[in-house]
């Protein structure tokens, strides 16, 4: 990342994985109560921010299917500007590397990186708690990325406790299908009554020797997604012939953990054509964590 008084270049918006995802209930407002552990990855979109003196917020990169006015990046910058009353503006460029509709948190991570980066570039010095309160208005996953640590999440994903996770390498495979989160949450067959657990339940069963917490939990959305999207089911099936794997979020990405980059790369080399993939190392902290106190 390059940091000058006028710009911030090459800011990572890291992907996340849900090491497990349990749906424990549904609130009167329609939102689902969740429990999950979020894992940050050293892989994601790259954002570039350049200061403007005219107060305007402008996205300089076209993102297919995402109009500028509805882009979470622009919404995050505009929200921060409105909250603080700053006269500063910004040009934002994005190198989009994460697939959309994949359960990796790409748009939410972009929004969080925007909040953190502009907190520095605009010299706002807002505390993390304030940025998180703004993040809630942008989406359920955005507060986690502003929180900036691997976390045990509850509620709709906004109640977060930092958790230490072992360093490991992940192979993330994404079939070329878009899974709409809202549609999966509305499915009648979706499990909505998983028994609540505690953070100590997860930590006690983590298998740090193998580097994969497959002894704990599941993704409650996975059976619904694999029943409706054959390509996701194929990826899950391919992985289970090799190593334990799990879908992240509402899909479509499926991941497995490995002890080393070499092991993950060897598995990646066996993938059939037509699936996108990435090998990524776990992160313990968001790269822009220091941009808020």
From Swiss-Prot:
Its EC number is 2.7.1.148. Keywords: ATP-binding, Isoprene biosynthesis, Kinase, Nucleotide-binding, Transferase. The keyword DNA-binding does not apply. GO terms for biological process: isopentenyl diphosphate biosynthetic process, methylerythritol 4-phosphate pathway; terpenoid biosynthetic process. Pfam families: GHMP_kinases_C, GHMP_kinases_N. Pathway: Isoprenoid biosynthesis; isopentenyl diphosphate biosynthesis via DXP pathway; isopentenyl diphosphate from 1-deoxy-D-xylulose 5-phosphate: step 3/6. It comes from the Bacteria. The active site is at residues 16, 141. ATP binds at residues 99-109. Catalyzes the phosphorylation of the position 2 hydroxy group of 4-diphosphocytidyl-2C-methyl-D-erythritol. This is 4-diphosphocytidyl-2-C-methyl-D-erythritol kinase. It comes from Burkholderia thailandensis (strain ATCC 700388 / DSM 13276 / CCUG 48851 / CIP 106301 / E264).
């Amino acid at each position: 990342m390059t940091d000058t008084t006028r710009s911030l270049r090459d800011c990572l918006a890291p992907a996340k994985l849900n090491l497990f995802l349990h749906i424990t209930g549904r609130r009167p407002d329609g939102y689902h109560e969740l429990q999950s552990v979020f894992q940050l990855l050293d892989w994601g979109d790259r954002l570039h921010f350049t200061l403007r003196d005219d107060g305007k917020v402008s996205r300089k990169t076209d993102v297919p299917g995402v109009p500028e006015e509805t882009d979470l990046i622009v919404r995050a910058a505009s929200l921060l500007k409105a909250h603080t009353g700053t006269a500063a503006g910004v040009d934002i460029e994005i190198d989009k590397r994460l697939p959309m509709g994949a359960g990796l948190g790409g748009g939410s991570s972009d929004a969080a990186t925007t909040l953190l980066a502009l907190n520095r570039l605009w010299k706002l010095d807002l505390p993390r708690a304030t940025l998180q309160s703004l993040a809630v208005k942008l989406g359920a996953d955005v507060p986690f990325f502003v929180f900036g640590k691997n976390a045990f999440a509850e509620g709709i994903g906004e109640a977060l406790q930092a958790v230490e996770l072992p360093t490991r390498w992940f192979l993330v495979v994404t079939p070329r299908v878009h899974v709409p989160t809202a549609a999966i949450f509305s499915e009648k067959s979706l499990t909505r009554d998983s028994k609540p657990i505690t953070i100590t339940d997860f930590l006690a069963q983590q298998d740090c020797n193998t580097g994969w917490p497959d002894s704990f939990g599941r993704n409650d959305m996975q059976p619904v997604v694999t029943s409706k999207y054959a390509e996701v089911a194929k990826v899950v099936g391919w992985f289970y012939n090799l190593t334990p794997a799990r879908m992240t979020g509402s899909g479509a990405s499926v991941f497995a953990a490995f002890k080393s980059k070499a092991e993950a790369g060897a598995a990646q080399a066996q993938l059939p054509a037509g699936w996108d993939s990435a090998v990524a190392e776990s992160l313990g902290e968001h790269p822009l964590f220091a941009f808020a106190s």
